[in-house]
Amino acid sequence: MNKKKKIFILGVTGQDGSFMAKLMLEKKHIVYGLVRKSSTGNLSNIKELIHKKNFFIQHGDLLDFASLERIIRKIKPDEIYNFADQDHVRWSFDIPFYSFNVTANAVIKILEIIKNYSPESKFFQPYSSNMFGNSINKKQDELEKFSPLSIYALGKTTAYYACQMYKEVYGLKIYGAIFYNHESEIRPEEYVTRKITKSVARIFYGK
């Protein structure tokens, strides 16, 4: 019989976080989801999960390091998924310090908390294809040279190297993946690719 794991998902109200929460609940695990107090009215992506017995909302903020430490120390999660992000490249030029804090400094703080209080936890950190900048190659992997051209991409690149360092120096169980644009029916229409896919769907259905 598979062990029932404790899963902590940062950014649980977003596209990726909510899908991960649903998957983990289907696997009969216990899911804790980080939700900002300011986001209490934006729970549409997890409304069907809120009353499930193995789903627990944890109030905190990616930049409120005390709340992250409190939650991780209390839960001692088996797995941590960091889907919380400021993922608008354009916005990162307008709010550079905030963007870098969210995409880079917060990740380092999470790694420090894991190292000090929950070293057996597995940690998953998503990266971004924006780290490659204007790469001329049609396909990229970790061997491709990083060339960040935005604060958002710079933060993701910093997070990548921080995760590599904590994995090699401290032996933490850190995993990652480089994300490219990916769509679903719940992705906000403020994203260009979502606008495109929704327009295609309207054309297909003759609307």
Question: Positions of the model-derived regions?
Answer:
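N-terminal Rossmann-like NAD(P)+-binding domain of SDR-like oxidoreductases, especially those catalyzing
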Residues: 1-184, 205
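A glycine/serine/threonine-rich, flexible loop-to-helix segment
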Residues: 138, 189-197
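Alpha-helical substrate-binding/gating segment
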Residues: 168, 194-207
